[in-house]
Amino acid sequence: MFAYYIELAVRSLRRSPGLTALMVLTIGFGVAASMTTYSVFRAVSGDPIPWKSSQLFVPQIDMWGPTGRGADGEPPEAMDYTDAMQLLRDHRAKLQSAMYQISPSIVPADASKHPITTSGHAVNSEFFPMLDVPFLFGSGWAAQDDIQRAAVVVISSKLNQKLFGGANSVGKTMNIEGKDYRVVGVLNNWNPQPRFYDVVNSGGFSTGLDDVFLPFDRAISMGMANNGNTNCNAIPKESGFVGLQHSSCVWIAYMAELDDAAAAKTYRQYLDGYAHQQQQSGRFAWAPNNRLRNLPDWMDSQHVVPSDTKVSLLVALGLLIVCLVNTAGLLLAKFLRRSSEIGVRRALGAQRQSIYAQFLTEAGIIGVAGGLLGLLLTGLGVLGVGWVLPKEIATLARVDFVLLALT
């Protein structure tokens, strides 16, 4: 019987090709709009490290006071050098790392080749285990290397391919800014999006890849300039990179791993105690105004997920509902026009359930055809999101099995 219902439905649809095409197009465009928008929203709103994000915290210390706060009373988003170094020395977290963005030049061994400008971060040794960074070869450096300001480096697999042909380069040397550095680890295609470990400088998303990671104190001692954001509430008294370190300018991102709520509470008390000490010493002339947010809350406070993607998703879902309602209305109008046909079939003995089944089959064919068209248009939509969204966000949208299943 089902094959018979399909045959009747196809005949009915062929009798009104224009109306049939309109209904299929309506569903197809509604599905494509909602799924394309959802693919973007899913990419930008995903948890980059779901198994650990609740244990990663970003501390904020108010070193500027009331005059440097925004309307919401928030302290600076980053840290100055003085506070970051003190938190590192006190080491009240399970794991912790200060970090700032660098852009060193790599001098190839082949003198005929031009230097390579790279991007990366200066971090502490605990950065790698804290963020569960995957390695293709080797590992991060040891804590002793931080203390000794050792000339060691962790590089990306992309840079490893360019410099060493993709071979295991651990133990080999490379020239960075005119100095030899020993490779201790090669990352395994690690480029989390959103780039949660330095939201302040990346805005959460970046098309670029961090190719080098150097010891924080080593980079400072070598005078590697900050390639990220620097915000000041007063002009530094000294010029240059050394003057930046002695100023109240904020340019260092900081992250700490805390196992549970009790550890987070203890760490928050430590931050407040530290601010009290600075107040008593005369450095701060205001009461503590610190923050300690876990990673999801931190990304929310930084508005990592663009608000327009949320609005676009709601609008697209609303459009899908409108399309489905319109299609249902068109089908209902079409079925009501066939009331005489239904009466004749009922007079000949057709059961009410049989007529319902035929109409449902016809509606199902429209839905399947619209869904298939929507699938095709979704693929085209994902390819074209770069025309309306920033490149660093558009490149994250993709068609995969989950999206196909939802479509």
Role assignments for model-derived ranges:
Residues 317-327, 365-368, 375:
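Hydrophobic transmembrane alpha-helices
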Residues 302-318:
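N-terminal membrane-entry
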Residues 37-163, 167, 176-182, 192-195, ...:
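Structured, solvent-exposed hinge/loop segments at the ends of secondary-structure elements
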Residues 30, 343-351, 370-378:
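A short glycine-centered flexible hinge/capping loop motif at secondary-structure junctions
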Residues 15-49:
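Short, strongly hydrophobic transmembrane alpha-helices
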Residues 126-140, 151-303:
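Mid-to-C-terminal secondary-structure elements
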Residues 363-407:
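Small-residue-rich transmembrane alpha-helices
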Residues 6-18, 325-366:
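Intracellular coupling helices
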